[in-house]
Design a protein with these regions (language model features):
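Catalytic cysteine-centered active loop of the rhodanese-like fold, especially the PTP/DSP P-loop
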Residues: 67-122
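Conserved NTP phosphate-binding and transfer environment spanning the P-loop NTPase/kinase superfamily
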Residues: 234-239, 243-345
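Long, charge-dense
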Residues: 117-133, 254, 265-268, 272
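Glycine-rich phosphate-binding P-loop
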Residues: 143-162
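Conserved nucleotide-sensing/catalytic segment adjacent to the nucleotide-binding pocket
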Residues: 163-232
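Positively charged, proline/Ser/Thr-rich regional signature most characteristic
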Residues: 16-88
Length: 345
């Protein structure tokens, strides 16, 4: 087949992604740092080869870098083409590199030798990142569900989502439940870069004329940092804060965390030891060693409750709507939250 070099703008590329597989031809290290969700890595160069070509470019110029790149890539061309043939759908592929330049163009030519019709991402992954960060800074109708640790916010949002409410699960995307204990039982966290890619995809499926609910989070969720632009949007959105007593929250926290080994709980407590103070940290550690989880949880909640109340006090006047509840029933509390949302100005 004749080789035709076709480059698409980001919007068109992402629209075609719904039906056409994406081959990311950057190095494995670049891909691991962040990639278009669903893209498959078929690298032109591995990480060491990419570094070598970059060094040749700096020292000897473009032509010698191209020649060295051909030397390095040529032995693996058949394997790259086989992977592309396995990935292609209906003889078509979407292909991108970092800037939409030589790497994606070279791989598109290679794939054409196997009869694959490739469309390239104009501007590459760099253009995609600029696009999504601009979109994440776009004004949306966010409503933040806040509440004290253990008040069941995640369960409430899931209940609301099952009823057709638009919800973005930030903790799910970040693989972390948002406290010193948040990594327990979770998959490895994505990079902050890839989290933003996942977040963009999630929000892209939602309607602009309906509110989007988010759980109240600080700028970082574990090791993941939200984009500054998105975090600032969250900080100015209305907050509905669910307030309940420690005794009401305690059964849920016991159910969630006592399934983990005591040493893992202990390690999580030590992460906040400076904030708890030496005496309270020792008391929590002693309680854990004795299997007295309720006491350990109460001690940690003293810190988290104080910190959360302080955070709410920093919000703008009238930004926070408080709901007091005496039950941990998810359906009941979801109804209370939705009623409060209807009364927002």
């Amino acid at each position: 087949m004749a080789f035709i070099l076709r480059k698409l703008p980001v919007d068109a590329f992402l629209e075609q992604r719904k039906t056409t597989p994406v081959a990311d031809v950057r190095s494995p290290g670049e891909y691991a740092e962040g990639h278009i969700p669903g893209a498959v890595n078929i690298p032109l160069f591995d990480d060491e080869q990419r570094a070598e070509v970059g060094t040749v470019y700096k020292k000897e110029g473009n032509i010698n870098a191209v020649l060295r790149g051909i030397d390095l890539a040529a032995p693996g061309m058949s394997d790259k083409l086989r992977k592309a043939l396995d990935l292609a759908s209906g003889g078509k592929l979407l292909v991108h590199c970092w800037r939409g330049g030589m790497r994606s163009e070279a791989m598109a030519w290679l794939f054409s030798q196997g009869g694959i019709d490739s469309s390239l991402l104009g501007g590459g992954y760099k253009a995609y990142r600029n696009h999504i960060l601009s979109d994440l800074d776009r004004e949306r109708k966010f409503i933040i569900l806040g509440g004290l640790t253990g008040s069941g916010k995640t369960g409430i949002l899931r209940h609301m989502k099952s009823a057709g409410v638009q919800v973005t699960d930030l903790e799910g995307l970040a693989s972390h439940r948002g406290s010193a204990f948040g990594a327990l039982g979770q998959a490895p966290q994505p990079t902050s870069e890839h989290f933003a890619n996942l977040l963009y995809d999630d929000l892209a499926s939602m309607r602009d004329d309906e509110p989007i609910w988010l759980e109240d989070e600080s700028r970082n969720i574990g090791t993941v940092f939200m984009p500054d632009c998105f975090s600032l949007r969250m900080q100015t959105a209305p907050v509905i804060a669910l307030m309940m007593s420690i005794e009401t929250r305690l059964p849920r926290l016991l159910e969630e965390y006592t399934t983990f080994p005591a040493e893992e709980i202990m390690a999580s407590v030590m992460k906040i030891s400076k904030r708890l103070g030496g005496d309270r940290t020792r008391e929590a550690a002693d309680a854990l060693r004795k299997g007295d989880y309720p006491t350990a949880i109460r001690i940690t909640l003293e810190y988290y409750d104080k910190a959360y109340h302080y955070g709410l006090s920093k919000r703008a006047e009238g930004q926070v709507t408080y709901i007091n509840t005496e039950t941990d029933d998810v359906a009941v509390n979801a109804a209370l939250v939705m009623e409060a949302a209807r009364n927002l100005g």
